Swiss-Prot record:
Keyword set, alphabetical order: Ribonucleoprotein, Ribosomal protein, RNA-binding, rRNA-binding
Complexes and interactors: Part of the 50S ribosomal subunit.
UniProt xrefs under SUPFAM superfamilies: Translation proteins SH3-like domain (SSF50104)
Record's function text: One of two assembly initiator proteins, it binds directly to the 5'-end of the 23S rRNA, where it nucleates assembly of the 50S subunit. One of the proteins that surrounds the polypeptide exit tunnel on the outside of the subunit.
Source organism per UniProt: Solibacter usitatus (strain Ellin6076)
UniProt-recorded name of the protein: Large ribosomal subunit protein uL24
Family: Belongs to the universal ribosomal protein uL24 family.
GO biological process: translation
GO MF entry, a single one: structural constituent of ribosome
Length: 123
């Protein structure tokens, strides 16, 4: 009896980018705000600064100059559990998209706040 291989999951469409400020909606860190350090679209997870802290036990390795001990670091959380914080209204909001026409007949899609309409993309 052959074991069927699982297909790799399709990448998840995540509207968050690195350096965005987000607010955690669920879990043990509910209500905390932090900066996005990394986005993994393959697994649908984001790494948020000072959120979901775990203790990592590390063995010393003198060859690689790694000091042993218990290190505290962030763990990834599901992107559906966070919302972006608007810099204008300072609230956790959903993201809308506006299409702006630029020179040469091209269009650029920008992320905007659904509550106040301010652009969320950095210049």
């Amino acid at each position: 009896m052959a074991i069927a291989k699982r297909k790799p999951a399709e990448p998840v469409r995540i509207e968050l980018k690195k350096e965005d400020t987000v607010k955690v909606l669920t879990g043990r860190d509910k209500g905390k705000e932090g900066r996005v350090l990394a986005v993994n679209r393959e697994t649908g997870k984001v790494l948020v600064e000072h959120v979901m802290m775990i203790k990592r036990h590390t063995r010393p390795n003198p060859g690689k100059q790694i000091k042993g001990g218990i290190a505290e670091r962030e763990s990834p959380i599901n992107a559906s559990n966070v919302l972006i914080v608007c810099p204008g209204c300072h609230k956790a909001v959903r993201i809308a998209h506006h299409i702006d026409k630029i020179a040469g007949g091209k269009a650029r899609r920008t992320r905007v706040c659904r509550k106040c309409g301010q652009t969320l993309d950095r210049k």
